[in-house]
UniProtKB/Swiss-Prot annotation:
The organism's taxonomic lineage, starting at the top: Eukaryota, Metazoa, Spiralia, Lophotrochozoa, Mollusca
One function term, GO molecular function aspect: sodium channel regulator activity
Name of the molecule in the record: Iota-conotoxin-like R11.12
Coiled-coil boundaries: none
Gene3D superfamilies linked: 4.10.40.80
Top-level taxonomic group: Eukaryota
Family, as annotated: Belongs to the conotoxin I1 superfamily.
Modified sites of kind D-leucine: 43
Task performed by this protein: Iota-conotoxins bind to voltage-gated sodium channels (Nav) and act as agonists by shifting the voltage-dependence of activation to more hyperpolarized levels. Produces general excitatory symptoms.
Propeptide residue range(s): 45
Amino acid sequence: GHVPCGKDRRKCGYHADCCNCCLSGICKPSTSWTGCSTSTFLLTR
């Protein structure tokens, strides 16, 4: 239920972890990125 997080390939959990997952499926390091959110779209625990 996790996806790689950017270059360091750490795992993404919920938004409190290292990154957020955008609807495009790309992991971004911050909620401030355009198109990103703290939703659980790709964060199924």
